Amino acid sequence: MGKPAFGRSLLFVSLVVWLAACSGGLFAQSLQLSAPTAAPGEWVAIEMALKSPPGKDILAMQWEMEIPARQLDLANERAMRAVIIVQDAGKSVTCAVPKETRDARIMRCVLAGGQKPIPEGKVTSLSLKILENAQPGPIRVRLQNAVAVSGDLERVSFDPVETTVTVQPR
């Protein structure tokens, strides 16, 4: 039982590790962003959807959005809104822009309130105006530093996620 047995054992261990890695992604928490399309001068909405970890109700969340300032405009810090089902759970969203440069705005948001969990699915909508001088093509918007607290008061981290706002030609 020399090399062939070792090879089969290595193959088996590799398969188990691969399956564990794949299934972990299937059951992990995640955030997703919609990818809107519009022309310069028009408004778009980026919707954020939540997938909670199994057996973990999310009570509150915090995240940052990196928004390219030369192509997209925030009307104000109230541009982020909780959807109706989230409001019905007693939650509200509050945002601020703690960092702003010529190239980008960092918008930090907190979604919290009440004792009910945040329902899975669409949770917020961010309204942005495509600036008149925006060139046709994709504009990258990034959600980062997202963390949540579960019903059992455990910290839940989320991977960064990106989307694109596609600017159509006029």
PLM regions and their residue ranges:
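Generic detector of intrinsically disordered, low-complexity segments in short proteins
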Residues: 1-4, 168-170
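Acidic, low-complexity intrinsically disordered segments
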Residues: 25-170
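Bacterial N-terminal signal peptides that target proteins for export
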Residues: 2-13
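Bacterial N-terminal signal peptides
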Residues: 11-25
